[in-house]
Regions:
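Long, basic N-terminal domains or extensions that often function
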Residues: 1-189
Length: 189
C-alpha cells in the first residue's frame, strides 16, 4: 500500500527546506529497509510550511524471521552421565525449554555439537511500527538550532502545527509533537 507522511510547520528557513525534505524521505526509507520492508517509487516534497514523503507499494507486514540462539557445547551442557549441568539448565530456563527434551535442540556448529534454539518471529503489521519509525526518522534530521514551543517538551526547527499519516486508504493516528496525526493538511494561512 502507499505510505504518506506530512509534517506541517511554521515557516521553515528557505535554505533548509529541500535538504530536510530529502533527508526525511531517506531516513524513512532507511527505517523501512532495516525492517526488511520492500517498497517501490519514493517521492520527497517540501515547501516552507511542510515536509513530506510518499512511498509507493510499501509492504504491509514485516517478513517472518528466524533467530538462531546457540548455547553451550554438549560437552559443557551435559556431564559424563548425560545429566544437565548448570550451563545446560541455564539454557533451558532462558528459552523455557523442557529439560527432558533438550536432545532435540542439539545441532552441529562447524566443529562441535551445541545446544541450539531457533526462535521464529512472525511478521507484524507495519502500522504498529509507524510511531517508532517516524520518530526515528525525524530525530535523525540534522537540525542545529531547535525550538521548543507552547508547554510541550518537543523540539523541532520550527513549531509543528499538524501532521498527516496515511497508509493505503486508511488514516493512521499516532502521537507526534503533541498532535494526533490525521488526514487533513493545510494550505496557505
Amino acid at each position: 500500500a502507499d505510505f504518506l507522511f506530512e509534517l506541517g510547520t511554521e515557516e521553515l528557513p528557505s535554505s533548509a527546506v529541500e535538504k530536510l525534505g530529502n533527508l526525511l524521505l531517506e531516513n524513512l526509507c532507511e527505517e523501512f529497509k532495516k525492517l526488511n520492508l520492500n517498497f517501490n517509487k519514493t517521492e520527497a516534497f517540501a515547501t516552507p510550511r511542510r515536509l513530506g514523503a510518499k512511498i509507493n507499494e510499501l509492504d504491509c507486514i514485516t517478513p517472518q524471521s528466524i533467530k538462531i540462539n546457540w548455547g553451550p557445547s554438549t560437552s559443557i551442557a551435559f556431564d559424563s552421565s548425560g545429566n544437565l549441568t548448570k550451563a545446560g539448565e541455564a539454557f533451558a530456563n532462558k528459552f523455557k525449554l523442557d529439560r527432558n527434551a533438550l536432545n532435540q535442540f542439539i545441532k552441529q556448529d562447524g566443529s562441535q555439537e551445541k545446544l541450539c534454539y531457533e526462535e521464529i518471529s512472525m511478521g507484524v503489521g507495519v502500522e504498529t511500527l509507524f510511531q517508532q519509525i517516524i520518530l526515528s526518522a525525524i530525530t535523525k534530521l540534522p537540525i542545529s538550532k531547535k525550538m521548543r514551543w507552547s508547554t510541550n517538551r518537543d523540539y523541532f526547527l520550527r513549531p509543528v502545527r499538524w501532521a498527516v499519516l496515511m497508509f493505503g486508504e486508511q488514516t493512521h493516528k499516532i502521537e507526534l509533537f503533541s498532535f494526533t496525526t490525521g488526514n487533513k493538511t493545510r494550505g496557505h494561512r
